[in-house]
Amino acid sequence: MPELVVTALLAPSRLSLKLLRAFMWSLVFSVALVAAAVYGCIALTHVLCRPRRGCCGRRRSASPACLSDPSLGEHGFLNLKSSGLRLHYVSAGRGNGPLMLFLHGFPENWFSWRYQLREFQSRFHVVAVDLRGYGPSDAPRDVDCYTIDLLLVDIKDVILGLGYSKCILVAHDWGALLAWHFSIYYPSLVERMVVVSGAPMSVYQDYSLHHISQFFRSHYMFLFQLPWLPEKLLSMSDFQILKTTLTHRKTGIPCLTPSELEAFLYNFSQPGGLTGPLNYYRNLFRNFPLEPQELTTPTLLLWGEKDTYLELGLVEAIGSRFVPGRLEAHILPGIGHWIPQSNPQEMHQYMWAFLQDLLD
């Protein structure tokens, strides 16, 4: 009898949760269809303006020389204990200090940390990984292989597999989302965090529900919920949408050279090269709604005032979840989303100051 009473009392809450999830998914796919129409028009325009490129992306047969620059470190592979997957990484400065682990975003790879690898290898063991699905790292095809839980276990296995019990975690964009959650579920493995242009998913969900303008900034996330179509649209006219994302005069990465652009496009141009990265997004809303969680890891947060994809209000929202005194946040005036590549000197100054006590 008590079980029946409890079930009856919980029924309204469960029904409300199901209705909320149904509403959320209907909203997600409605926006996804609108985004697909918009991006379809953009992709078609690129094809019409550049007919010689055709409707498909050109497969690159050789990687650009900048990916083999010895000044950035040595290339290696790590077999992960939990999944058996093999992840690619670039490492420099082993034996020079604590482990500094870099997590990249989309549409990037380990190479997005080239400035930081050079800057910090004198005092830290710097390691930039290609997350699962990216670059030469293993890329399972199944969408279910890219859940947040599995990605967090990958990070844990990288830290332990490199022979460390903790690290300084430096992350941008998608890597930032993973870093936030990693610090919650594996706090003993994170000594400090440096987070650039990225919010915890629970903060992002709550903020977006109250600020519809953030939904519009994140329109691409909804497009990526759809199967196969995003891969097709992003590859049309030789990956022109990705090229524009990375090189746009106002919203892209300033001074990105043709060779550096190819460093990002090379692996995306391989068969199935976009599916793994897009599967991250296809798992993004699975656990909606997320419960807010307290953040306790000492963290340096850097945010571009002109970030195209994320509103400034998210900085305050992130701060409200922190234990007092654990967050140091800086908004960089006139700077956009790609801080590690567009403004490395400013980023390095903040990082050295934030980490100085670990080096004394």
Swiss-Prot record:
Topologically, how does it sit relative to the membrane? Single-pass membrane protein
Reaction equations catalysed: an epoxide + H2O = an ethanediol; 9,10-epoxyoctadecanoate + H2O = 9,10-dihydroxyoctadecanoate; 9,10-epoxy-(12Z)-octadecenoate + H2O = 9,10-dihydroxy-(12Z)-octadecenoate; 8,9-epoxy-(5Z,11Z,14Z)-eicosatrienoate + H2O = 8,9-dihydroxy-(5Z,11Z,14Z)-eicosatrienoate
Effect of substituting D307 to A/N:
Loss of catalytic activity
The residues that cross the membrane are 22-42
EC code(s) of this entry:
3.3.2.10
Q: Where in the cell is it found?
A: Microsome membrane
The annotated consequence of D173A reads:
Loss of catalytic activity
Can you supply one Gene Ontology CC term for this chain's record? Answer: intracellular membrane-bounded organelle
Q: What is this protein called?
A: Epoxide hydrolase 3
Q: Which organism is it from?
A: Homo sapiens
Lineage here is:
Eukaryota, Metazoa, Chordata, Craniata, Vertebrata
